[in-house]
Structures are given as C-alpha cells and as structure tokens.
Amino acid sequence: IMPSLVGSEMCIRDSHYLHHQPGGQPYADEATMAWAVADAAADTGLGLTVLPVLYERAGLAQAALRPDQRRFAGTPDFIARLQASVQASGRPLVNAGVAIHSLRAAASPSIDALLAQVGDAAMPIHIHVAEQMQEVRDCLTHTGQRPMAWLAQRHALDARWQLVHATHSVPEEIEAVARSGAGIVICPSTEGNLGDGFADLPAWLGAGVPMALGSDSHVGRQWPEELRWLEYGQRLHLQQRNVAAAPAQQPATAARLLDAAVQ
C-alpha cells in the first residue's frame, strides 16, 4: 500500500486474491485478509476499493485449482459476502466491488451466480480478459468465441465493468465494448514483464472507450511511468511517433493520454 502512495497513486482498486491460509484453510474470520488490506489503506490515507476475486479453477480445461492456488479459492457466495462486509465496515476511504479473475479461472455458471447477487448495485466489476493469445485460443476452443465477444454477448456489460488488459482484440469486439459503456484497464509494465503483447490503443481511443491505467502485478507503481510506457510501447510496436495524438481533437500526445486516463 505505501509504495503505491509514494508512487503518486492516491486512489486504487485492488484485485483481492488472497483469502485463505496456506493450504487453503479459511481463517476464523473469512475476511481477515481483506481487513488487512483495508486497514493498511486507511492507515496510509490511500483511497481503496477492495475487489474480492472469484477464482475457482486453473484453466478453461481444468476443473480445480492447483494446490498452490488454493489460498485464492472463492465461491460466488463467498465473494459477495466479502464485498458486502467491506462495504459496510465504515472504514474511511475504503469501498468494495467484485472481480472475476478471468474466463479461464471462473466457470460460466459461477460468473452468472455472482452477477445475480450483484444485481444492479452501483459497484465496479473487474475481469482480466484477452491478456494473452493462449487465452484467446482456449476461449475459441471451448466457447467458439473470442473472450470479449463472449463477454459482450453473454453478459450485459455496462459502465460498471472494467476489462483489464484487453490486449488482443478485433474491431467487432472494440465496437461491442464501446456500445456497452464498459471501460478498459491497460497495464503497460505488467504486460511488458509478461510478454503479453500490445493493446490496439489507436482503436480503443478512436472508439471512445473509457481507459484507465493499472499496475496489476505491481511491477511498477508510478502511474506517470505507466502512461509514458503506454505510448512508448505503441511507438515501438507500430514504428511511428505520437500514436495517441489526434490532430483534429487533441494534438498533444501527453494531454490526450492524460485526459483519457483520468476521465
């Protein structure tokens, strides 16, 4: 928490994975780890939205978690309870939403069950999606659709949804997300560290999709550097300069990126 504050981050959303003891046994208070994060944020004065993560399997073709992932396990009921507990706790600067790790880590019926409990409540809903091409290939194999196309068709995406990474897309998916009002969260340092690839930044900006910056695995914790490398990565990928600039709208690259990131 403190490194985030030092890195000029004043308000963050935390994908909260770590729920249980080593080995997967629950704590006496099932929200123990959520309280630890929330209290750290309150102590440092950092605005925090805790996003308990639905995580139940190791992959689209794997029905269970690996032993080293059991600390992350959570049912839809459990995730909904954690969200409600944190939101009702009254801690200063602390709110709560929910997260679905990814289509590969949560089965469709479980996603449906969690969203049914969320209903129309005004809370953020995050999901990692289309981060790597292997995920896209697996999703095509198991569902017949690309990840963002599946999400847009299967669920009523709206402005509460934030699609984290959204690295590998086709125009039809970008159009569907734009129509829904959902946003994307690009995480340049993590995507670079993991070799994920480059999001189609010109297309996302051109479609008017709301964009935020994320650190995801906390490889970097300084948002100005994340913003810088968002543009630099695009320049390297496309072999051109001022990728984010829009001469007819906002000719200054930095200004357009900053406007997009803070809207």
Model-derived segments and spans:
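Single conserved hydrophobic/aromatic residue that forms the stacking wall/gate
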Residues: I1-I12
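Metal-coordinating catalytic core of metallo-dependent amide/deamination hydrolases
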Residues: G23-T167
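Conserved, mostly hydrophobic/aromatic
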Residues: A41, V98, H128, V177, ...
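Histidine/acidic-residue-rich catalytic or RNA/ligand-binding cores of hydrolases
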Residues: L60, M133-Q145, P171-R179, G195-W204, ...
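Glycine-enriched alpha-helix->loop->beta-strand junction motifs that scaffold or abut catalytic
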Residues: L115-P124, A156-A159, A176-V185, G206-M211, ...
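Short, acidic/turn-prone active-site loops that include or flank metal/cofactor-
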Residues: E131, P188-N193, D216-V219
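His/Asp/Glu-enriched, well-ordered alpha-helical/loop segment
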Residues: A149, Q153-R160, P202-Q263
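Catalytic beta/alpha-barrel core
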Residues: W161-S169, C187-T190, G214
